[in-house]
Amino acid sequence: MAAILRYQLELFLLAVSFFSRIPVPVSLPYSSERMNQAGRYFALVGLLLGAICALVYSLATQLFSTNISVFLTMVLSLLLTGAFHEDGLADMADGVGGGMTAERRLEIMKDSRIGTYGSSALIMVLLGKYLLLTELADLTSLVPVWLLAYTLSRAVAASLIRNTPYVSDTDSSKSKPLAQQLSGTDVAVLSLTALATLLYFSWQFIGVMIAASLIFRQIFRQWLIRRLGGFTGDCLGAAQQLMEILIYLILLAFLQHEVMI
């Protein structure tokens, strides 16, 4: 049992090292197989990041206004992840916006330079998050909001690996170890982690959020297959960012119509 728990802890720390800038022991064992299995903890890494952001936001509100506290927490989030998912969103936007064929889109996505489409997507998403979070802060505590959004969005993004073709042909791609299909156990861990953050909310909200997550996943997956033939690591980052925005929108819709969440 101790060996099993140690192995799972090592997988979690591997996920932390891949999906964030949080330091982990340099002696952590690594292999492509372990990295693929670590995908099951993508949502748990989100929960950790959300908890850190929630704590810092709570402390910041003791010194600054809500708007400044939200801004500082967003900056912290970017530092914690190295803008990992935002980078994926920008690359995908450039590729899909600038390419006429799937091959050309994938080629553009490999270019590290950011273009007009990527810049526009980043501005809109970051501005959208700021506006939504400041609106939500006037209506409810942001602590459970950070936890839910950071966890569920990553669970949905990682679940795409389960049954979506991987289309990058770059052997050195940073997401290559995650390209294998997730096992049933991996999906179960992702789902249970996300569900844990939903239990704070009402059953009505939980039902809507689960339905919205499944619908978003299906629509985004089909769109990726049509436009690219499958997914790349950049697409997972884009999925996380868009799903996070969707979560904030649904929360705000519930609260503004005075429906209990």
Swiss-Prot record:
One of its GO terms (molecular function) is cobalamin 5'-phosphate synthase activity. Keywords: Cell inner membrane, Cell membrane, Cobalamin biosynthesis, Magnesium, Membrane, Transferase, Transmembrane, Transmembrane helix. Its EC number is 2.7.8.26. One of its GO terms (biological process) is cobalamin biosynthetic process. The keyword Magnesium applies. The chain crosses the membrane at residues 9-29, 41-61, 64-84, 114-134, 141-161, 196-216, 235-255. Its cofactor is Mg(2+). GO terms for cellular component: plasma membrane. Its main location: membrane. Pfam families: CobS. It comes from the Bacteria. It catalyses: alpha-ribazole + adenosylcob(III)inamide-GDP = adenosylcob(III)alamin + GMP + H(+); alpha-ribazole 5'-phosphate + adenosylcob(III)inamide-GDP = adenosylcob(III)alamin 5'-phosphate + GMP + H(+). It is a multi-pass membrane protein. It is found in: Cell inner membrane. Pathway: Cofactor biosynthesis; adenosylcobalamin biosynthesis; adenosylcobalamin from cob(II)yrinate a,c-diamide: step 7/7. Belongs to the CobS family. Joins adenosylcobinamide-GDP and alpha-ribazole to generate adenosylcobalamin (Ado-cobalamin). Also synthesizes adenosylcobalamin 5'-phosphate from adenosylcobinamide-GDP and alpha-ribazole 5'-phosphate. PANTHER family: ADENOSYLCOBINAMIDE-GDP RIBAZOLETRANSFERASE (PTHR34148:SF1). HAMAP family: CobS (MF_00719). This is Adenosylcobinamide-GDP ribazoletransferase. It comes from Vibrio cholerae serotype O1 (strain ATCC 39315 / El Tor Inaba N16961). The gene is cobS.
